[in-house]
């Protein structure tokens, strides 16, 4: 949408992803961030729910903070397909004109978000790590102070391969769209009984040559625990040296009932599967304790773990960037430190 009618666009909308009629956690995380943005703008939060027979999910969205829920309930939306979902979400945007539209950077969201942004002629910033309301340009150009725009969505994300951080705005088009990875934002506590206003919207979905027919759905069967749920993570990087040495990290994790995770280098070396990777191209985690062992601390990795409650780094390089984000740091040989630390903690636990 061009800048002729920007003032018509009001409210913060989020796409409430559901799969098999079960809401994804990212929906609640987006509501949590949307509430902050809406407070700064003096507006409300609307969740957009697409699917078939999904009206029963509206109560939960209200309990997590949505003020309104727009429901598009249509048999064509039973299982995610790009075309009908893109038509439905674009229709919602064109009808209700949100100022901001947030989408989860999931497999579904990374397909849906860009498709919809192109159809409604606006920009989209992908994989944001920070969202806030502010001025753009952030610093007014001397002599052009009147050109600075206020109450803009400032979208921050890693750029140039993660070697720098960029803050991006979309001042001349609406809605301002962003995708956010799961785990980056925090959901609000559930408020039992809180109700959202439910709005039923039934746009026409037109079958065209971009529709696909789903012949069969084969669900992946996995027994991998989710590192995003762990209270204690013992994470290893290139400095661990080998797949066999991760047994040493597992022993430390077992003391706490925690899990082992890793950096991208460990995945590339075949030491652990990508399910266990923390960072920009892995998962964002917030454990109570995060051990960074043999991890240098590249910005890509730090982006996925810097909000852990307590960070303990072990590295032989005293100048490793990881020490700048760690609460505690130990410089030395991890092959000596980790087993000694494990035994000391075991003894401490035994005495309690």
Show where each model-derived region lies.
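N-terminal glycine-rich FAD/FM-binding segment characteristic of electron-transfer flavoproteins
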Residues: 1-352
């Amino acid at each position: 949408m061009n800048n002729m009618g920007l003032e018509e666009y009001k409210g913060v909308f989020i796409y409430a992803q559901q799969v098999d009629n079960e809401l994804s956690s990212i929906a609640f995380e987006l509501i949590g961030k949307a509430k902050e943005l809406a407070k700064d703008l003096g507006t409300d939060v609307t969740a957009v729910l697409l699917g078939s027979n999904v009206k029963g999910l509206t109560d939960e969205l209200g309990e997590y903070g949505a003020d309104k829920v727009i429901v598009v309930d249509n048999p064509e939306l039973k299982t995610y397909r790009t075309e009908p979902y893109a038509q439905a979400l674009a229709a919602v945007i064109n009808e209700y004109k949100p100022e901001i539209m947030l989408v989860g950077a999931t497999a579904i969201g990374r397909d849906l978000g860009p498709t919809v942004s192109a159809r409604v002629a606006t920009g989209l910033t992908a994989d944001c790590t920070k969202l806030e309301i502010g001025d753009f340009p952030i610093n007014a150009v001397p002599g052009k102070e009147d050109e600075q725009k206020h109450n803009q969505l400032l979208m921050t994300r890693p750029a140039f391969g993660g070697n720098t951080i960029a803050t991006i705005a979309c001042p001349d088009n609406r809605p301002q769209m962003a995708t956010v990875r799961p785990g980056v934002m925090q959901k609000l506590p559930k408020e039992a009984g809180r109700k959202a206003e439910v709005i039923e919207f039934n746009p026409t979905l037109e079958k065209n040559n971009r529709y696909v027919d789903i012949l069969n759905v084969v669900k992946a069967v996995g027994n991998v625990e989710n590192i995003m749920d762990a209270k204690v993570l013992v994470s290893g990087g290139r400095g661990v040296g080998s797949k066999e040495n991760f047994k040493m990290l597992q022993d430390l994790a077992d003391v706490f009932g925690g899990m082992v995770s890793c950096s991208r280098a460990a995945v590339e070396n075949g030491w652990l599967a990508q399910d266990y990777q923390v960072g920009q191209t892995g998962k964002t985690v917030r454990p109570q304790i995060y051990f960074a062992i043999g991890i240098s601390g590249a910005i890509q990795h730090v982006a996925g773990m810097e909000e852990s409650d307590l960070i303990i780094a072990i590295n032989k390089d005293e100048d490793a960037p990881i020490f700048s984000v760690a609460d505690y740091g130990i410089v030395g040989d991890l092959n000596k430190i980790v087993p000694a630390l494990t035994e000391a903690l075991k003894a401490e636990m035994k005495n309690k």
